[in-house]
Regions:
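Acidic-enriched and Gly/Ser
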Residues: 1-130, 146-148, 152-155, 159-180
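Short coil-to-beta-strand transition motifs
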Residues: 127, 134-142
Length: 180
């Protein structure tokens, strides 16, 4: 899908050198909505256990807005770049459909220890079936059932094609319905 300049889309972007949270604060000031997938990290420091909430992917940020407006703000933030994919010989910014982004954010916001972030090339989507979760914490989320190399159980995947995927295990078979 080629994004139009005046169409509101979620754009997958990269804020180099791990500055995605700095960019997110700048975008808040500019009144532009953004999303950075976050996770809890627990580390032991001496005798204490410290829990931090950190970005799941160091440079990744999703920005909602008209491409023209994002370009304007991007001019003030030299380390913010579109993530692109080649289409017809051009590198086109990745625009994420609203419904897909809402599903992805819902899963990320409910993540627990059973969830993990998976790079796109580690998942073979052709073996999975499209399913909808009908119960539990992930009710109404749609994704695929897949087998990830090195994992014993099937996992539920919600992905943003070519960018990132969230993988969750522990969803009961009776909480799934096949779609499509």
């Amino acid at each position: 899908m080629l994004p139009e300049d005046r169409e509101v889309n979620w754009f997958a972007m990269r804020a180099t050198y791990g500055r995605n949270l700095v960019v997110q604060r700048t975008l808040e000031v500019e009144k532009i909505e953004s999303f950075v997938p976050m996770c809890k990290r627990t580390t032991k420091v001496g005798r204490r256990i410290k829990t931090d909430i950190i970005p799941v992917v160091r440079d990744l940020i999703f920005v909602l807005g008209e491409r023209e407006r994002i370009q304007e703000v991007k001019g003030k933030i030299p380390y913010l770049h579109y993530i692109t994919r080649p289409i017809e010989g051009r590198n086109v910014p990745i625009a994420v459909p609203e419904e897909q982004m809402q599903q992805f954010m819902a899963i990320c916001n409910k993540m627990d220890d059973s969830a993990e972030i998976v790079a796109g090339e580690e998942v073979n989507f052709s073996i999975g079936e499209q399913v909808r979760v009908t119960g539990g914490a992930f009710k109404d989320c749609e994704g695929r059932l897949v087998k990830i190399e090195g994992k014993r159980t099937k996992r539920f995947i919600v992905s943003i094609d070519g960018v990132i995927a969230v993988s969750v295990s522990g969803i009961k078979a009776d909480e799934l319905e096949k779609i499509g």
